[in-house]
Amino acid sequence: MITANKGLSLVLLIPNLFALVSGGLQYVFDVRRRIFRPHFSQFWTIWMKFFSIALVIITQIYVGYKTKNIGWNFFSVVTYCFVLFLQFAEQSTLRVPMASLLIFWLLKVVTSLLILLFSPYIAITSMARLLTLITLFCSLVCFISEVYVPPCNRVWYSDDTNEVEEKGIRPSEVRYANIFSKLSFSWISSFIKFGYTNYLKESDVWLLPPDERSGNLIIGFEDWWIYHSKNKRRSLFLWKLLFFNHWKLVALITITKLIQDVLAFVQPTLIQKTILFISSYTSPNPESPSRGFIIAILVLVANFLQTLLLQQYNQLIMLLGMRWKTELLASIYRKSLLLSSSARQNRSIGDIINYMAVDTQKISDLPIYLFIIVSGPFQIALALSNLYHLMGYSAFTGVAASVILFPCNIIVANVYKKFQSILMKNKDSRSKLMTEIINNIRSIKLYAWETPFLQKLLHIRNTKELSMLKKIGFITAIGDFAWIFTTIIVTTVAFGAFIIFHGKTQALTADIVFPAVSLFNLLQFPLAMLPTVISSLLEASVSVSRIYEFLIAQELDYNGVQRFPATEIPHEICLEIKSGTFSWSKKTLKQQVTPTLRQINFVAKNGELTCIFGKVGAGKSSLLEACMGNMYKNSGSVFQCGSLAYAAQQPWIFDATIRENILFGSEFDPELYEKTIHACCLKRDFEIFTEGDQTEVGQKGASLSGGQKSRISLARAIYSQADIYLLDDVLSSVDQHVSRDLIKNLFGPEGFLRTHCVVLTTNSLNVLKEADSIYILSNGKIVEKGNYEHLFVSTNSELKQQLSEFNDEKDTQPLPEHTTSYPSTQISLAPSIHVEGLETYSSSERKDSSNKYKSRKRNPIRQKVTEDDKGKCVAQTDELVQRGKVKWHVYWMYFKSCSIGLILLYFFFIISGIMMNVATNVWLKHWSEENGKSSSELNPSPYFYLGIYLFFGFLSCAFISSSSLTMTVLCGIRSGRYLHDSMLKTILRAPMGFFETTSSGRILNRFSNDVYKVDEVVSLTFMFFFRNSIQVLFILGVICYSAPLSLLLIVPLFFLYLYNRAYYVRTSRELKRLDNVTRSPLYAHVQESLSGLSTIRAYGMQETFVEENDLRIDTNHRVWFMFFSSSRWQAIRVECIGDLIIFCTAFYGILSAIKGSPNPGLVGFSLSYAIQITQGLSFIVQQSVDAENNTVSVERILEYINVKSEAPEIIPENRPPCEWPTDGAVSFNHYSAKYREDLSFALNNINIEISPREKIGIVGRTGAGKSTLAMALFRIIEPTEGKIEIDNEDITKFGLYDLRSRLSIIPQESQIFEGNIRENLDPNHRLTDKKIWEVLEIASLKNCISQLEDGLYSRVAEGGANFSSGQRQLICLARVLLTSTRILLLDEATASVHAETDAIVQQTIRKRFKDRTILTVAHRINTVMDSDRILVLDHGKVVEFDATKKLLENKDSMFYSLAKESGLI
């Protein structure tokens, strides 16, 4: 050995042993598995390291030769040779320096410095000194090279390279960071610097590491779920899955936390050592000054190591929470695509969004508290162990006192769990109703129903949800007080026991009191956190149970339909149902269900058009759903041969461009695409739009008319190249002439789909003549089948009876010869099936078809936006993202909503509580100094001192608990109520343009996540921020009082602290805003997907939509990952400032003692507070940032509160007479209007006069402005120029409620609301049941509703899903019949109903509204042929307005051409 000192010899062994063991393990399990790619681009650094190692080896050999110490030097040479090999392997295979090499070189530097520092005190030769100097120099060179120069030039990992090329987003630096960079979070420094100087955009945020991406995480989650599916037992199974699927991370978190706890409990020991050292200077034999300085250094090192481990622990628990949330979000979405119809009826879209927005958040927050369950008992054990060594058995007596409070806390916990469960149900109810309101806002405005829906939602919100939240707040406050006061009781009892057992032999002096106080403060954390842990665990348990019940809900039976590949046989059966009986709910032992379809025998063949005909509610749409497997098959069998395309009755249009809606993930084929849009009569529509088929349609196709939506949905089906086409009444919402064009282009002798299997439900008698077979449905049964000629000549034919009822209609005329024709080239739609869980296949080419169009791979439904696409016409605006600091106005509005008086009351309570807390420690200092002074008694008047201590402690707990109750319950709930109610009222009063340009996901995000933050998070964050800020100010005051010279260090550290906060807060604030912005598209995508679930399933697009959902999850979570990583970056730097303050306090106390001014009581008092400042400073920064970030939710709510409203509901000084309008005269005077300022005129210079009781038909081609004219009458859009008068009164001078409630409308889209039938007809509850039944009989609904179990109070599912489209339209008719207005507007009211139902509506209107003014917007020209006058619109202008007869006599009129195209002439 080179030294005789055995201690240093052992120190020198440590680096070598570490290199051999750690380096060997890292090489075996990591390096050698990687691909060998020699890469020496950093030429000079690698050769510099090789040269340094070679120099050390040569020197080591030389020294060994000279000193004859062969064994030690041989061992060292072997170690360096192995290190040289590792350096070469690192350079050849790794992108990141090896952790073992970095630590080895650091240890070498430290050990070499130790040898040189202690060389005066140990025997060391000149040769050994030379070796040490060379080793130090070479180790320092290698260490610096390893840290600052990567092994090779930056080369991305392959998975990062793909992401960079596809998205242009930078990979996360954490993958390329060395171990020291990871420990200090320096890898994120460049990003924080960028955020400090730039406003962050989504594209600036780095990618997630691959292990954190949803696509990778969900694989393990699903594998675990499937593997253990047989052992699933309630929600415990999901708990096990969440933990065991990440057991390595859980184990690492636990180990890290336990080591950090040990270091935390080293502090009281060092405080005791410091006090004992200072106390020695009050005796004749003081200790050596070097011992005191070593203690001070140990204080610094222990705190620094604790800081590193604590921040690693915080990073890991956030990572675990994010993984849990990712897996749950992904699994919930995947499950929602698989839910059965009955399961969907019990879980609305609002419920599912609530699972994703609220429940997953509660579960992801749980790891913050969860590991205290392990750490807490360990901390308590350490505290009691140290207290035992400090105070003996008396330390345990205090613990017994805490046991008394356990039953109380158990009761509190049970009550809390019960209340939390009720609260979540109330949140679900509110979310569900809010979703209904947003989805049906147009109807609410047209019917002037804002007030009843407002009252209904406020009842749920204020009477139920906030009331329960207030109860939870009181219960939490009681639990908090009980557990905080436990520490005071434990301390009091322990000190009392010490006096009793040891009072006569030992004084309770500072070296016992303040270490004990520090230990009791450390003991306070697990005890004080226990209520929070219990409440968080209970909240998460409720959420886990809810999610688990959702994940095990019934799924569609994909085996209900037997699917086979398409064949080459020309007329083979493509779709067949044999003796099928179907229902929407599954029959169980407890639940008997009535089948919707009974004994269905149905066949659809290749190359044939099969039509399904029947009255409203007969089961036409249900039959198509049964063919797709979306209903429960109670008996029989269903066979499907080939791929499927589906066009729904209510067209599903997602938020993208028109082209993307048509392609729906298919490759773009210009020729096929061109023929598709011609066949679907879309060419002219594209010419209308500024951007053609690149126009963004908005959510639910907000910028499209009903006919355009239907034809785009139809074009999607045509373009998909399927074998089987299921078309659900696609002709109902298009103009009559367009309908005839579609019939010829698609179903005629040379139609586009003539060589394919087409199943069409229809109310159009015209298309039946083209059908190869017709099925007549009635009450869920097939009552007749045959072709048109067969059914028509049959004496008792159901079809013939209906035709005879309408034999006076011209709708049954043959197709006119002049209908637009298209090339007769046959287009092959090569079949391919895309059904989840089945093998993808492609049929052979049909004999009579070209093989030009093959089945195509599905692509993302939304294409990447290029620079050329920017600036295109969009239907929805980007979400507004505020920049810079949250404005002071936002804070002021929040505190104002809390009540300034209550805020001041909070400050009174918290300042008083902290003052009382300081008073308890000042009293302990005074008591400890008095003890031992008296020669006659070691501890004079102990019970007096204990009584005062207990009194101060009780006051402190009472004040602090009162402050918590004031801020969270009184302020938080008051603010939440005000902000939510104000936002709700504003949104209900917002113009329709707001909803057309704002996705429902954004709005629902405000009402779910942002309202949750305001209710439960913002007040809590401000409470902790104010509490910690005041507490730190008191601590700094104590330190400055006890160590005045520490101001010399504290003042510059304070400015460094402020700079660090300012440097960090800009990035953090922008990340938090981006987090809010990127969350909205996730919920919007969920809502959009669930709205079009049947379409997505039919096309087999589940996987594409799942990938889109995963992408949106990752987009949000890469922002969140950078947010909490940047939080760790600032915390580790701020806490280092706190560590220096603690070191300064201890060093000053030691220095003062050495210089002759020992004061152990004051030093102990100041140190007991100083050790709190590290966490305190970090908490202040984090909580100030959290306060600002969470206040962003307030800012977002205020943004919606300030949305421009419609005109007032009521203008008191301009209220119309009760009987207004008495006549029903309507006049448009030079009326012009736009939907938005940036758009062209939708109506231009309209001048018409409509007499009282006149019947006006409004016609025109698609996009002519027919529905816009109707919206203008209801002031859904406001005039840009001119005015509308009703009975000579300008309608703009009246409030909107007064106007809209005096008009009646049957809208184009029949929207009904979840609840019951009565609420849908009379939400104001003004009418009797008798009156409603009378109206239902007139509307032909009485028989249908009376058969329901609960009659008028029967449940209506979300969106009226349990009623057919025709029934929903008749409910809208019933609403009109319940009003007594003079003006009725029919906006294509019978577009989607059966001809017989159409007749019912028309006859009812003619009979019941003959003395009223009626304006009819029509697609079917025959429905307005008996109108008094016809208004023809084109491009928003009046083209013709005259009597029907006169217009028909004029063969040059547009109306004449429309009537002729419809076959009515």
Curated annotation (Swiss-Prot):
Domain ABC transmembrane type-1, residue spans: 250-539, 903-1189
* Record-annotated ABC transporter domain positions: 575-804, 1226-1460
GO biological process terms held by the UniProt record? heme export from vacuole to cytoplasm; transmembrane transport
Q: How does it sit in the membrane?
A: Multi-pass membrane protein
Positions contributing to heme binding:
151-152
Gene3D superfamilies on file: ABC transporter type 1, transmembrane domain, P-loop containing nucleotide triphosphate hydrolases
Keywords, in A-Z order = ATP-binding, Heme, Iron, Membrane, Metal-binding, Nucleotide-binding, Repeat, Transmembrane, Transmembrane helix, Transport, Vacuole
Please give the residue ranges for the topological domain Cytoplasmic: 30-42, 91-97, 151-235, 313-362, 416-480, 533-899, 961-1033
A single MF term (Gene Ontology): heme binding
Alphabetical list of Pfam families matching this protein: ABC_membrane (PF00664), ABC_tran (PF00005)
Specify which residues bind ATP 1 according to the UniProt entry for this protein. Answer: 614-621
Q: What induces it?
A: Induced under conditions of iron deficiency and negatively regulated by iron through fep1.
Q: What is its main location?
A: membrane
Q: Where is this region: Disordered?
A: 805-824, 840-869
Family recorded in the similarity comment: Belongs to the ABC transporter superfamily.
Name the record gives this protein: Vacuolar heme ABC transmembrane exporter abc3
Q: Which organism is it from?
A: Schizosaccharomyces pombe (strain 972 / ATCC 24843) (Fission yeast)
**Gene name, Swiss-Prot/TrEMBL:** abc3
